[in-house]
Amino acid sequence: MSERPSDLVVNRLVLFVVKGTATSTHNTVKPLILLEELGVPHDIYVVEKVSAPWFSEINPHKMVPAILDRSPDGRDTLRAWESTSTLMYIADAYDKDGTLGGRNVQERSEINNWLTLHTAALGPTAKYWLYFYKLHPEKLPKTIEKLRSNITVQYDILERRLNEPGQQYLALKDRPTIADIATLPFAMKSTAELFGLEFEKWPKLQEWSVRMGEREAVKRAWQRVAGFGHGEKEYGMLEA
């Protein structure tokens, strides 16, 4: 095993992130929102190089977010990596009444449907659009436009869902869940504008995103994630 940084001590849940930029926060904010919603004590570790051997042992995909946590008996260190997995882990470990993760099989099955849809469709489509539009050295207009077109298809699906009678949130009618948290960063006005889309074309989706954005936990998470790596300590362990 590669030697981990000396300041990486797992006494409680540790969320791994990178320095906050315009394009680095859309996935890391998801578990942070859930931690804020549930009031879970945690630490933040800002990774300087996700390609570092020690970090690839935590997440073989070499991306954030990722989590290390103590097992309930304190004997082992548990890990979760990729944003959807971190949401599922936090909900399973800390959402004891199932408010955000689902209270029964019926709720969890619907939550998993919309969580999986995001993981398989909007999430990766939006991520690759951002990559080809912002980071890829060669501009590929057809690729960029195809990905943007696929995003509109996903927005259409979400709009139809939210147009169903009484459907205030994606999975459940009465309250948000981890499916809403996963979807929000790529289905909100600022992100749609980044894609060059008029978010007003999806009025129910826009209403939903505003409703989600007004939650105090969501506000705190967005504020915090933007500042990671910009304080007195740029990289390494930051206490929550």
Swiss-Prot record:
Gene Ontology biological-process annotations: gliotoxin biosynthetic process; mycotoxin biosynthetic process
Biological classification of the source: Eukaryota, Fungi, Dikarya, Ascomycota, Pezizomycotina
Domain GST N-terminal, residue spans: 15-98
SUPFAM superfamilies, per the entry: GST C-terminal domain-like, Thioredoxin-like
Gene Ontology terms, MF aspect: glutathione transferase activity
Family named by the database record: Belongs to the GST superfamily.
Protein name per Swiss-Prot or TrEMBL: Glutathione S-transferase gliG
Origin species: Aspergillus fumigatus (strain ATCC MYA-4609 / CBS 101355 / FGSC A1100 / Af293) (Neosartorya fumigata)
Domain GST C-terminal: 104-237
Catalytic activities: RX + glutathione = an S-substituted glutathione + a halide anion + H(+)
Record-linked InterPro entries: Glutathione-S-Trfase_C-like (IPR010987), Glutathione-S-Trfase_C_sf (IPR036282), Glutathione_S-Trfase (IPR040079), Glutathione_S-Trfase_N (IPR004045), GST_C (IPR004046), Thioredoxin-like_sf (IPR036249)
Name of the gene this protein is made from: gliG
